């Protein structure tokens, strides 16, 4: 288990879809430094050819190091899963991708990270270029454990949004299994919560901002580029 530096606070950021310039604009504006910045997914990693992508990541690592920020990210549905596990996982001094079910400790509290979600517009995307068949939530009950904080990309059924919007139904017209898979994915998240029992949960994916306490857990949905810390 990785133990994070207790002297560095953790900031969390919502989906930014590879718009690193805008992300740095926000970190500069908020004077964020000497910290961990953890993305709840959709960092846009994998949309470029591998050689170009790795060059970009090395440059980003240098920039985060200059800002004294250690950036880490779980995978979203708009990330190539291969960069998040195995030998291709990114682990540089100031830039790291987090494998599903990883547990870290910060100031005595346990944090578990579980990425993945289903793209509602997958029917118009190109496999291996802008869509990856392994994008969804992968359930592994053996790796779950009780933690204080749970970081995911999608969320259980009781979290916002509780209903499908018109956009989802429109995409479902060209994707016969979409509604079924979206429903199952969120139900599986509910099973994950039964084991993890976190008191704090952060997620992204839905491009909105929401927070509410449900069954003793504070849930917070981070909007695009929204940055939040428990110490604000």
Give each language-model segment a name.
Residues 18, 22, 52-59, 130-143, ...:
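Soluble or luminal CAZymes and related metallo-dependent hydrolases
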Residues 7-17, 108-117, 148-153, 218-223:
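Active-site-proximal beta-strand elements of phosphoester/diester hydrolases
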Residues 45, 72-177:
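Conserved catalytic scaffold of divalent metal-dependent phosphoesterases
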Residues 42, 155, 206:
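Flexible loop residues that form catalytic
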Residues 147, 151-152, 169, 189-203:
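Proline-aspartate-enriched helix->loop->beta-strand connector
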Residues 3-9, 13, 18-106:
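Core catalytic region of metal-dependent phosphoesterases/phosphodiesterases
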Residues 104-107, 191-195, 207-232:
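Binuclear metal-dependent phosphoesterase catalytic core
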Residues 66-71, 196-199, 217:
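A short helix->loop->beta-strand "cap" motif at the edges of active sites that frequently abuts
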């Amino acid at each position: 288990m990785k133990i994070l530096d207790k002297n560095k606070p953790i900031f969390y950021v919502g989906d930014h879809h590879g718009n690193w310039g805008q992300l740095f604009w926000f970190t500069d504006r908020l004077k964020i430094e000497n910290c961990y910045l953890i993305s709840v997914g959709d960092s846009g990693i994998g949309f470029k050819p591998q050689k170009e992508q790795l060059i970009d990541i090395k440059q980003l690592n240098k920039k985060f190091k200059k800002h004294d920020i250690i950036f880490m990210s779980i995978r979203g549905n708009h990330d190539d899963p291969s960069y998040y596990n195995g030998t291709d996982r990114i682990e540089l001094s100031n830039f790291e991708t987090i494998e599903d079910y990883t547990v870290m400790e910060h100031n005595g509290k346990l944090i578990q990270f579980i990425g993945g979600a289903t793209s509602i517009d997958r029917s118009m995307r190109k496999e291996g270029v802008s869509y990856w068949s392994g994008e969804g939530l992968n359930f592994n009950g053996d790796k779950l454990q009780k933690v204080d904080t749970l970081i995911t990309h999608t969320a259980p059924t009781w979290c916002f949004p509780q209903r499908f919007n018109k956009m989802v139904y429109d995409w479902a017209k060209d994707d016969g299994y979409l509604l079924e898979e979206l429903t199952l994915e969120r139900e599986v998240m509910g099973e994950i919560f039964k084991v993890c029992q976190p008191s704090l949960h952060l997620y992204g994916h839905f491009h909105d901002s929401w927070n509410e306490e449900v069954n003793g857990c504070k849930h917070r949905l981070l909007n695009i580029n929204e940055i939040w810390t428990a110490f604000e």
